[in-house]
């Protein structure tokens, strides 16, 4: 059961809010425990809890190899973007992202971002939605 979290400010973290809000309890369960038929696509937008979702979906991912769209932001995960992407790719996926309407590899985006940082140049376009397709 998740309790004491808020979606005010687009987060599931317990935060102090100036606005009034109420708490509700919701049942949580692993995706692997949902007795689903074949799964072709999964959208994950859980404000830093991506690892927990993936950990609870290993059987589903291995069985169905669904395409994934995952919002990953370092400010929510408190870990390097490279680690989060590598974790999904280790499950047999290839990471992709859209930049200017063009689909490209997440690996290239990460490389260009690191190179810009090393040069002290502005980072490439900020990307937080990543597409993962089975390899």
Segments (PLM) and residue ranges:
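Active-site beta-loop-alpha junctions enriched in small/polar residues
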Residues: 73-75, 101
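Short internal loop-to-helix segment that lines adenine-nucleotide cofactor pockets
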Residues: 3-64, 75-83, 87
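Proline-aspartate-enriched helix->loop->beta-strand connector
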Residues: 65-70
